[in-house]
């Protein structure tokens, strides 16, 4: 079956106001504004890899350091110049609060909105022709860069964008203004659509991280993007709206959610090739260009295409194989056959083929036929590897056939996509032969990670040991005052049908300003996360509980089993300082029939702390919840 596509490159060219712009922005995120990396060296390597755009920032706080006085920092112009002279197009983010307006919170007052707009205007005027791509905020919905202020609302963001967009277009009518990079999913994005965000931007920003869903193939991302297009059509009169994926990546940290360099390279290659089949996608920015540090267990230190000292990683070479090609290429044809996706691109006057194997556990042998008469040798390139020359002629010697077919060529594609270039205009796919090759059966060295702590879960009626919460994570400038500020302990028992938890919290100030359990994490509350031993990384059970308006409230955020089995929750106040949470959590919620002696669960427990000025931190037993979701950092529950 064949499908033919015409890439809507003209739409983007019209937006960008110049024929020199790429068909597609193959980009990478940098952190020059955070004083990370060396712009000249980083950008030289980015250009060598064929990357045509970088995404960086110059924050409001750095520009307006005295109220009413806007001064563009020198580093901004320097990294712009370094990028532009290498043919790299910067995408610049306008972001984050300023302490002179609304106390540093999300800009909402008229004064703050005006201040933010002035800052944006100053950046656009300063950048001039060096920048055509701008994004109004980064992860407004996720709280990035806004420590202590929680997450922004759809209403607040659309109000901001309505203020800023027309003023920027007046200064730079050819600029492409991209909306906030939504990171919490389609629900928030759709809420902004309802509020009219599509009328106040030239393109939609979206972040699509799924690396914590360890067994999720790139094809699931591709399906998600197709569904995103349908969502846009439903609010845009059945028409496309350009979309930029301004962050996507697979970090190489040593954790259950980490990918090996080889896995990241494979995912990168498949991701960019799939992206080029979607005409509404105008750019995809890999996060990150450079590792942020050397901590092998920390995701942010291991997202890069290159190490912290610029040593290339395997994904860098995959990017080098594809970036220059895909940024200028036009998709001519897409063919699917027997689990193969074969893409035919035109880049200038030449064509090239890209083969993607979509069948897990199988390698695909591809037989090509030259229907012309040239028999020119072709260039074969496994993405990320050195190209080599292949001449025509195929002998099926494994089937004991002696004859050579002079106008045929055989290549095999596994997980990593494969490229064929040269005189391929009259080259056609003749046959696809599957060969079983299940890489999940490869014997690999297994690492053993022992939990940092464990708790015994005793049968109901027996006195369980009280386990203290020992780690406080500070999120704002308000310092943790020790045990007199916040302390907690828990006991765990069980019946065959349920896990029984009692958490006793002593807090010098109890404050819960929220009216809904979904956002109760912003105030004094608890969050629990569990995983059954041997479960896939992405499958876990998460529970929130809080005292809201004097009444207990509980919700299930995620479940390994029957989500309708909501835990019973009783919360009691003991004087001014003590709150006790009693939870009965059904075994069925974990996907278990019953709890028995010898059973084990991994899990983490968290106490949120708000003394009246926002969520200032949390106390935890175990990690992997509160900042990043990582069941590999949970502690252990042992049922006695």
Task: Annotate each language-model stretch with its function.
Residues 336-384, 577:
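Carbohydrate-binding surface patches
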Residues 250-319, 335-337:
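Aromatic/acidic polysaccharide-binding cleft in carbohydrate-active enzymes
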Residues 35-38, 64-67, 72-75, 101-230, ...:
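Active-site cleft segment of glycoside hydrolase catalytic domains centered on the general acid/base Glu
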Residues 54, 83, 123, 134, ...:
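Conserved, mostly hydrophobic/aromatic
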């Amino acid at each position: 079956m064949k499908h033919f596509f015409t890439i809507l490159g003209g739409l983007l060219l019209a937006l960008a106001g110049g024929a020199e712009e790429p068909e597609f922005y193959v980009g990478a995120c940098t952190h020059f504004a955070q004083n990370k990396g060396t712009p000249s060296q980083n950008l030289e390597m980015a250009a060598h890899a064929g990357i045509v755009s970088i995404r960086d920032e110059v924050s409001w706080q750095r520009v307006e350091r005295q109220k009413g006085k806007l001064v563009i920092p020198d580093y901004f112009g320097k990294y712009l110049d370094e990028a532009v002279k290498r043919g790299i197009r910067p995408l610049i983010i306008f972001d984050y609060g300023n302490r002179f307006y609304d106390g540093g919170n999300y800009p909402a007052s008229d004064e703050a909105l005006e201040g933010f707009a002035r800052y944006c205007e100053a950046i656009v005027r300063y950048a001039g022709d060096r920048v055509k791509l701008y994004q109004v905020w980064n992860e407004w919905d996720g709280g990035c860069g806004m420590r202590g202020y929680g997450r922004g609302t759809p209403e607040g963001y659309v109000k901001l964008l309505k203020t800023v967009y027309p003023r920027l277009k007046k200064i730079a009518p050819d600029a492409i203004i991209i909306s906030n990079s939504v990171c919490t999913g389609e629900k928030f994005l759709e809420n902004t659509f309802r509020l009219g965000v599509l009328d106040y931007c030239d393109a939609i920003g979206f972040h699509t991280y799924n690396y914590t869903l360890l067994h999720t193939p790139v094809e699931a991302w591709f399906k998600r993007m197709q569904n995103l297009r349908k969502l846009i059509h439903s609010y845009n009169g059945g028409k496309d709206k350009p979309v930029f994926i301004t962050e996507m990546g697979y970090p190489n940290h040593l954790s259950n959610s980490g990918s090996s360099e080889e896995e990241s390279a494979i995912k990168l290659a498949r991701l960019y090739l799939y992206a080029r089949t979607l005409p509404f996608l105008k750019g995809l920015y890999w996060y990150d260009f450079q590792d942020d540090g050397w901590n092998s267990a920390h995701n942010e230190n291991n997202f890069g295409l290159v190490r912290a000292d610029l040593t290339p990683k395997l994904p860098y070479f995959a990017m080098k194989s594809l970036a220059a090609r895909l940024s200028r290429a036009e998709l001519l044809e897409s063919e699917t056959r027997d689990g193969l996706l074969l893409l035919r691109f035109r880049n200038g006057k030449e064509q090239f083929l890209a083969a993607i194997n979509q069948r897990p556990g199988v390698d695909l042998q591809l037989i090509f036929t030259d229907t012309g008469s040239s028999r020119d040798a072709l260039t074969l390139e496994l993405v990320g590897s050195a190209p080599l020359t292949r001449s025509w002629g195929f002998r099926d010697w494994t089937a004991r056939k002696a004859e050579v077919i002079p106008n045929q060529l055989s290549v095999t594609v596994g997980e990593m996509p494969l490229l064929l270039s040269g005189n391929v205009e009259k080259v056609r796919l003749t046959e696809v032969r599957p060969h079983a090759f299940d890489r999940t059966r490869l014997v690999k060295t297994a690492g053993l990670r022992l939990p940092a702590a464990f708790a015994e879960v005793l049968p109901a009626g027996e006195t369980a040991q009280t386990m203290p919460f020992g780690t406080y994570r500070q999120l704002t400038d308000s310092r943790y005052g020790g045990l007199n500020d916040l302390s907690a302990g828990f006991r765990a028992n069980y019946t065959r049908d349920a896990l029984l938890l009692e958490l006793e919290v002593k807090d010098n100030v109890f404050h819960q300003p929220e009216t809904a359990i979904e956002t109760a994490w912003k105030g004094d509350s608890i969050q629990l996360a569990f995983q059954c031993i041997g479960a896939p990384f992405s499958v876990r059970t998460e529970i929130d509980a809080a005292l809201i308006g004097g009444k207990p409230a509980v919700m299930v955020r995620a479940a390994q089993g029957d989500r309708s089995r909501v835990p019973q929750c009783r919360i009691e106040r003991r004087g001014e300082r003590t709150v006790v949470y009693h939870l009965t959590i059904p075994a069925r919620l974990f996907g278990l029939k019953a709890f028995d002696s010898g059973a084990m669960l991994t899990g983490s427990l968290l106490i949120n702390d708000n003394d009246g000025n926002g969520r200032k931190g949390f106390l935890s037993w175990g990690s992997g919840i509160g900042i990043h979701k990582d069941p590999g950092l949970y502690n252990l529950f042992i049922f006695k």
